[in-house]
Amino acid sequence: MMVFQSFILGNLVSLCMKIINSVVVVGLYYGFLTTFSIGPSYLFLLRARVMDEGEEGTEKKVSATTGFIAGQLMMFISIYYAPLHLALGRPHTITVLALPYLLFHFFWNNHKHFFDYGSTTRNEMRNLRIQCVFLNNLIFQLFNHFILPSSMLARLVNIYMFRCNNKMLFVTSSFVGWLIGHILFMKWVGLVLVWIQQNNSIRSNVLIRSNKYKFLVSELRNSMARIFSILLFITCVYYLGRIPSPIFTKKLKGTSETGGTKQDQEVSTEEAPFPSLFSEEGEDLDKIDEMEEIRVNGKDKINKDDEFHVRTYYNYKTVSENLDGNKENSNLEFFKIKKKEDHFLWFEKPFVTLVFDYKRWNRPNRYIKNDKIENTVRNEMSQYFFYTCQSDGKERISFTYPPNLSTFFEMIQKRIPSFTREKTPSDQVSTYWSFIHEEKKENLKKAFLNRIEALDKEWSVENILEKTTRFCYNEAKKEYLPKIYDPFLHGVSRGKIKKLPPLQIITKTYRKNNIGRSWINKIHGLLLKINYHKFEQTIEKFNRKSLSIEKKLSFFSEPQQEEKIHSEEEIKVFKFLFDIVRTDSNDQTLIKNFSDFHEINKKVPRWSYKLISELEELEGENEENVPMEPGIRSRKAKRVVVFTDKEPHDEIYTNLKDNQNSDQKDEMALIRYSQQSDFRREIIKGSMRSQRRKTVIWDFFQAKVHSPLFFDRIDKLFFFSFDIWGLKKQILRNFMWKNKKKNFDKKEEEQSKIEEKRRIEIAETWDSFLFAQIIRGSLLVIQSILRKYIILPLLIIIKNSVRMLLFQFPEWSEDLKDWKREMHVKCTYNGVQLSETEFPRNWLTDGIQIKILFPFYLKPWHKSKFQASQKARLKKTTDKREKNDFCFLTVWGTETELPFGSAQKKPSFFEPIFKELKKRIKKLKTKSFLVLSIFKERATIFLKVAKEIKNWILKNFLFIKGKIKDLSKRNKIPVFDSREIYELNVNQTKKDSIISNQMINELSVQKKSMEWTNSSLSENKIKNLIDRIKTIRNQIEEISKEKQNLTNSCTKLRYDSKIIESSKKIWQTFKRKNTRLIRKSIFFIKFCIEQLSRAFFLGIINIPRTTIQLFFESTKTILDKYIYKNQENGEKKKKKNTIYFISTIKNLISKKKISYDLCSLSQAYVFYKLSQIKVSNFSKLKDVFEYNIRITSFFVKNQIKVFFQEQGIFHYELKNKTFLNSEVNQWKNWLRSHYQYNLPQIAWARLVTQNWKKKINKDSLVLNPSLTKEDSYEKKKFDNYKKQNFFEADALLNPKHNFKKDSIYNLFCYKSIHSTEKNLDMSIGIALDNCLVSSFLEKYNIRGIGEIRHRKYLDWRILNFWFTKKVNIEPWVDTKSKKKYINTKVQNYQRIDKITKTGLANQKRNFFDWMGMNEEILNHRITNFEFFFFPEFLLFSSTYKIKPWVIPIKLLLLNFTENINVSKNITRKKKGFIPSNEKKSLRFYNLTKEEKESAGQVELESDKEKKRNPESALLNQEKNIEENYAESTIKKRKNKKQYKSNSEAELDLFLTRYSRFQLRWNCFFNQKILNNVKVYCLLVRLKNPNEIAISSIERGEMSLDILMIEKNFTFAKLMKKGILIIEPIRLSVQNDGQLIIYRTIGISLVHKNKHKISKRYKKKSYIDKKKIEKSITKYQKKTVNRKKNNYDFFVPENILSPKRRREFRILICFNLKKKTVRDRNSRFDKNIQNWTTVLHKKKDLDKDKKNLINLKSFLWPNFKLKNLACMNRYWFNTTNGNHFSMIRIRMYTRFPIH
């Protein structure tokens, strides 16, 4: 029963899954989604629903809905039916349909009497309206424009179509889904309308009901049609606005329009009659139309930015027979013919492509300049063009098919009706395909084996390696075309070259011989039915010897003598080069098809015009080029000329003025950028901004353009995100008392930021309007004249005249002196000062500022110097520092501290007067104080007397009162019990004293009257009293009842009362806490005093220690002075600043714990942290790594938890308690399916070269003691050193060394990712990854650290890596010095002080003596595992903590030494030549100690040679540099420029080469320099600048430390001064990224037991590809017990060229006949075969030692990932899929699984 139930349940699940995945359900779902893409067609539908009523209204509704549904149905059918899709999908058809219809509709609704209706009846008119409604809904549904920014929902159906087999069913189901969604939407709209009608609040609106607005409402209802049409028109205009209009766009001038000489016409290329059919890097049809005429200088042969075309001639009937013998005339005649053809072609072009060319150039494509060639390549989107092509021998849809091929194929089909291709059956195609590839494989195998045999025969390597041919266009300098543009390296379908002899030699016989030959390419594949098998056999029959090829190509100038190649070897080379394939010459069948073809050009997709940006035009960098208009929009900027030097001071200027404009040379200019956001973003002029990718403007006022990816990082508006946490933080911050000061500072900062923003806005508004700067500039000048010469003199006159009237002395001289001191300096818009008289250039258009120096303020009187006291003087100096002695003038005549700032408050004229008055009033008060005190004393005496009199009167009055009481008691008569009544009344009245005050008063009066009545009171009066008491009681009861009712109604406390109560409670608690604090504050103060006293006494105790230290230092300095008398040693002494207290701080810092966040937990980080831990601690982690690092906190020991938390690896307190999985299961399964990759353990071990296995046992490694010394290595080093060049770019010209550093860096990346084993063996990996260390050890001599390398957990020897590719940290060099340090256990700073001083005679080592530190590294056993991962940085870090200034960050990256040998005998002026030894050259320090010692004393041979022939040395240097930098744009611009200083040349060289770093100024220095520039510009123009210079230094505007900078400052000095800072740029280097990807996949290839070190087998290998022989000989010398094995190459396949290598590997990898492993697109784990494993299984295979593979590399790691995973270019036969992704493959059709 249970089984039956489970069976039913399983069937149900599978049934449900099938239903969900069925075409109908998916179609319904996607169709339903398309309803949400609301377009303007919904406007018509809604209008028909909302507005129309009655019979006509219902008809309109019906017609609207039918039209709407019909339109949508047509759209769905167009997905399936191709012609309809083409008709509706093309943008020009939609535009042509939309524009006239929109205009018609607009005029129809806006003009009532537009049509003369005449005698039409009402029914006819109504029917016409209904038809119009139907048409509106139908047509607008077809228009493919959307209100929403993306129409993704509508396109989902199109996307899913490619995965469906039953397409028609899918289309119908999606339409039904859309219909359901539409019905639901319309029902919802109807419900909303009903709700509006029924809702009284909306209907009974005051405005609608009032008579005043009834007319407006009716008018609105009548003109609804017009409003709808206006809305519709706006949306359609918005849509059309996204397309650039073909008439008004800005056309850029191509280089062909600039004109040219005869030479230009000779080399110019013409437009091909057919599209470029050899598209390689994703060309488009629009690239065909772009032609470029190559401009050639008279001297040079060909520029770098030339465009080369490889031509293929089919026959030569067009060439005239009667051509003249002259070459130039013949060429011109030839091109005339071509031009005529092009003229006819222009008429053949359809009108549509001219007007509606949606792929025109002025679409927003970026113009990114290429460093290699100036005319840039088009940077376009990749093509997604679907067409059938052969893949794996069968026809499949390729989505990267070249569109030009498919269009050409369709053109052929249309033009030639008889052209049909018989479809061969798929089996035959696949057999052909597999046969061809098998044959290819066999041929490649043969070639490969032949080359390996040649290796065994010890041929030279140059003959064995397969060479790639490059296109060389400068033989002298060996300059090549870049690989991208090289026609020889550009794929199978490139154009083939067949050279003609010169035109005059063409004869009839030549034609007869050559008429049957033609070349085969992809076009022939489309046109011909070729028996491929037969054709492949005929290739080999062709006799290559008959071929003769010219050496020179057609685009070079013709040589005088024709050189022909007849040798067999050269013909073979050219055969390989051009890949010539020809049919049999007897076969004449092919000629008929090609009789009309003349030539086909292969064009590089470049821009046909050379654009410059506006910024380049401003900078004037295109001085060499023809002056041209900028074509690229840059950020708004203006060129502000700061200083013009009309008289040249140096002789150098006279040399430089040749062929250059002297005015431009002698002026200094700054570029002023606009502060507003840059919406241009290097856009080309004429292109549309709205279609710029990755730009979204989503706000009304947006400061910057943002990509939609980063929306979550922008501070959004309130309704976008409600940040509760931020609010909570703000509330807490406000309530905290401690943060009051911080808040105040923050407020100030915010205020300053707001002020700055406001200033920038004002500046931009002035800059944006047309004539604003002219108006502002003229107003400022007027204001300055008014202020200086009218207002201020008037004020002086008025003041002094008033003083004279008040009988005061006038102050004419003082005021006039201050007035003359005020200066009005004209400044640029940025505030750079010029002078009083000189206006900045173009100040009316660019803007002006007027700066007032020492502004004049009117004072009521001037104090004499003697009057001012010492206190006043001090106050004056402090005020001076705070107050700036300058201001800027505004348009309104006010003063501001900064340009466009808020107006400053002037010191008031009347303020000192009021102050003086206050002082005098104070004096008067003090005088009157004595009089007041006397009056006060008298008043007190008088009050005392009055008090005594008062007391006496009161006593007498009381005495009389008592006597009267006694008399009344004697005459008293008892009446009832009046006392009781009285008491009762009093008690009751006390309860409600507030309510019944009147009653109490009456009662008291009654009582008194009763007390004082005589006994002769009548009974009537008593009765009246009793009645009165009763009434009062009744009244009291009523009042009490009312009071109860009131209290019951008010039992609920109000919100205000609650607040009052809570505030009372808070106040009470606060009082309580306050008293407690006061009580306990005494103890706290005591504790503070104790701590202070303790610290004080500790300081006193440490005093003798510090004094001893100082004493030792002083003695040491005296000894140094005594010993080292030389100046250089004296300089070194000055730089030995040591602080030893930092060692104590270091200990404190090390004790601090750092808490890590879980977000930083990556796999590399985890293993990096684990690698820093001591080995003994790994015993704790045994349980952790048992279960693949997947643990929950319940089963882990507390000790392990604590350990993890301390190391910052894991936090168990956090919610997410799972580790990241360190293995990649998906890739594992995929690799398991490739069963041929499975190798046993010993095979894995033997995959590495056995020559270089290093025994890790001490017993097996026997060192030869005679070779341990360094003498032999020193000689080698010295020999190597002699070979080194001594120019600026020497360190840059060593590609082998750089390659080595590259691989070490890549290896580190691999190690950090690749460690997944339990024992954390960081050395796991393939043999390829353990390379390069042997040569590293050989070069850097790190053998002193060899004791620690037997540690099995971390193979740290490999991990020496460089931060940069091209720059070297100084290696550990100083191994020769025989001096040992006395005490090895002393502190590091003591070691640094004991560094040897020898060998540094002529070299400035400003920061650190690396030699001694290197010696320590060699003799230093690493016990601190904190730096276990990077042991080379251990000493660096410790010394850096002690001496923070010693090793700045730049010295961990670069080490500069300056070799300055100034010889004054050689003058610079001869030929403008600077000898190399006089240059302050930038060098990367890479010397041995022996060379260091001899550097200052002995001249090396290389230097001597250079001194003998300085010019030849410089030529060699220039040649070397040009080889590396010939293709860079910067060199092109600067090669004609002579540098004024060495630093400029150094910076230029540095920045061109080291693109991994950017240089930036120190931020403080930047501001200082700008301030100095502003002051310099003013001082240069003044005759007596002393006063202003002193005042600017006082104000801190001009910093004197910058004035001390030398004129010719070298780059190294600028670095050392801290002026320039090196910052690493995060560049994405493709090679490194790929290597990391390969090695992540390589994780799954690692065998479990591969690298476990056992007792029997303890060998590891460290391999260097480049220096194999040298390192083998070295290690054979060093070790006695080595066996010799001959291995020639690390990877034998590297013999082949990369293309052949890839082809060979692919062909071997896939079994073409059996097809066992076929499914490369399905999920990875589908094809895992049970009998093959890669990981963790079949350990018995490890014992098999018979069939071991001797190849030293494995197939998989050397593959490029994209080529193996995708097989893009070769396997799928596609042309544009470089960046092939797995997602794209998975989206479309899969391969069938057999």
From Swiss-Prot:
Localisation per UniProt entry: Plastid, Chloroplast inner membrane
GO biological process terms on file: protein transport
InterPro entries tied to this protein: TIC214
Domain of life per record: Eukaryota
Record carries keyword Transferase: no
One of the record's GO cellular component terms: chloroplast inner membrane
Entry keyword annotation includes Protein transport: yes
Membrane topology of the entry: Multi-pass membrane protein
Pfam families on file: Ycf1 (PF05758)
This protein's UniProt keywords: Chloroplast, Membrane, Plastid, Plastid inner membrane, Protein transport, Transmembrane, Transmembrane helix, Transport
Transmembrane intervals: 19-39, 68-88, 91-111, 133-153, 176-196, 227-247
Similarity comment text for this entry: Belongs to the TIC214 family.
Purpose: Involved in protein precursor import into chloroplasts. May be part of an intermediate translocation complex acting as a protein-conducting channel at the inner envelope.
Assembly and oligomerization: Part of the Tic complex.
Additional detail: There is a partial copy of the N-terminus (positions 1-343) of ycf1 in the inverted repeat (BAF49986).
Full protein name: Protein TIC 214
Taxonomic source organism: Olimarabidopsis pumila
